[in-house]
Design a protein with these regions (language model features):
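Ligand-binding clefts of soluble mixed alpha/beta catalytic domains
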Residues: 4-137
């Protein structure tokens, strides 16, 4: 898939999530970085509930890459140390919850219970959107 096809597909997916009026529940279980995370039903795109497992990593980029960019002239030991600090301060599910990107950090064994609860809570969700003839994508 060439880059223009990928960009079109990402735009269509973003458009679909942004205009969906159904309950939107998201569970982050692993790595969720950059614009790919934003496109995949993030809180900023309109997700109603976002849960994260304790092992999730949420942020702009992976900690190792961020440390290599910020400390390009440092030795490997310093880069590893700074990557650990970055991961804790910027990419952890706790920091994502503090910023409002995640509603609750849940244990993997409780995922089913939380997702069912979210859909039960959102069962009566109604979104009033203005009438329009068509979208832009």
């Amino acid at each position: 898939m060439c880059s223009s096809d990928l960009a079109k597909a990402a735009a269509k997916l973003t458009y679909a999530f942004a205009n969906a009026t159904v309950p939107k529940v998201n569970v982050v279980i692993g790595k969720a970085f950059g614009s790919a995370y934003v496109t995949m039903n993030s809180k900023s795109l309109g997700a109603d509930m976002v849960y994260a497992w304790p092992t999730a990593e949420i942020g702009m980029m992976e900690a190792d890459l961020a440390a290599k960019i910020m400390y390009a002239d440092a030795d490997a030991e310093t880069i590893n140390e700074k990557a650990k600090e970055y991961a804790e301060l910027q990419s952890s599910p706790v920091s994502a919850a503090r910023r409002g990107y995640v509603d609750t950090i849940i244990q993997p064994a409780d995922t089913r219970k939380y997702v069912i609860g979210a859909f039960e809570m959102l069962f009566t969700k109604r979104e009033e959107s203005p009438m329009k003839k068509h979208g832009t994508v």
